[in-house]
């Protein structure tokens, strides 16, 4: 019996250490924003596809039709649509309504960032403004549901909704099955102190019923003193001292959330090799 027991234990250990994350990984459109070779959306999308990613973000509604057509022509996926939800406007942008209809059945996550003139200060809330957000998000969620799509509120530094707890509170009150939030590493770092960061896993676990997506990048786990904090909070994947692999493992394996994972690329300098390096880092993240 002992040899059988040993073999069984070895097989269990092998299975444990060979788990592979199967979440969808996609790249934000901001990558290679000033590259002279990949100077069109279609060229960029094709490079990203050839580099092994599952999809690409569509950034905003300008040139939406052209971008979507380019993606579909390549047999690729529009993983997310990053778009504005303006609380000073009484209705949804008609272009967004049309875009969601065109995305029907494509599995795209709609990612609204929420803005409001005369935004309240960080860490504060405005119940009346929240009610406006909830009203518009319910409309957006119903529209997205008709196309089989998920909606993930996108917390963003200096916008009306900039913290994940605020986004979760709004999503909970809106009470739509396809509405939740995106955990964006760079914006989370920009809106938290060191004590809050020690509770990351606890925060993620609390957010998990509402998590529709996460976005990651390399980062330094410090309180940035730079005039441009993104110099610490948005680095190439694989750079910086923040434990990105631990975050991905906790979300995808420990919590078992099979949600899309976006790669933040804002203001990163580089060319084709940048995409290749990020792709290599993603492959490393997938294996445990």
Predicted ranges, named:
Residues 32-40, 55-67, 84-95, 120-123, ...:
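Acidic-and-aromatic substrate-binding clefts and catalytic sites of carbohydrate-active enzymes
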Residues 48, 56, 71, 151, ...:
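Conserved, mostly hydrophobic/aromatic
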Residues 89-181:
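Active-site acidic/histidine proton-transfer and metal-coordination neighborhood
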């Amino acid at each position: 019996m002992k040899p059988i027991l040993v073999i069984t234990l070895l097989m269990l250990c092998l299975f444990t250490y060979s788990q592979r994350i199967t979440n969808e990984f996609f790249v934000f459109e901001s990558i290679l924003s000033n590259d002279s070779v990949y100077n069109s959306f279609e060229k960029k999308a094709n490079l990203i596809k050839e580099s092994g990613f599952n999809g690409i973000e569509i950034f905003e509604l300008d040139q939406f039709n052209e971008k979507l057509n380019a993606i579909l022509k390549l047999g690729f996926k529009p993983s997310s649509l990053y778009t504005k939800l303006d609380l000073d406007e009484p209705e949804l942008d008609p272009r967004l309504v049309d875009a969601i209809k065109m995305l029907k059945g494509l599995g795209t996550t709609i990612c609204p960032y929420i803005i409001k003139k005369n935004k309240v200060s960080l860490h504060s809330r405005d119940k009346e403004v929240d009610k406006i957000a909830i009203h518009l998000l319910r409309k957006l969620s119903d529209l997205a549901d008709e196309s089989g799509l998920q909606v993930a509120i996108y917390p963003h530094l200096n916008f009306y909704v900039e913290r994940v707890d605020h986004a979760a509170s709004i999503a909970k009150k809106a009470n739509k099955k396809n509405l939740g939030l995106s955990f964006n590493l760079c914006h989370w770092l920009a809106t938290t102190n060191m004590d809050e960061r020690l509770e990351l896993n606890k925060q993620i676990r609390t957010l998990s019923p509402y998590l529709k997506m996460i976005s990651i990048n390399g980062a330094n786990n410090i309180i940035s003193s730079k005039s441009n904090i993104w110099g610490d909070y948005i680095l190439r994947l694989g750079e910086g001292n923040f434990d990105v692999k631990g975050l991905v493992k906790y979300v995808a394996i420990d919590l078992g959330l099979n949600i899309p994972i976006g790669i933040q690329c804002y203001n990163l300098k580089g060319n084709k090799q940048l995409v290749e390096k990020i792709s290599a880092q993603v492959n490393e993240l997938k294996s445990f």
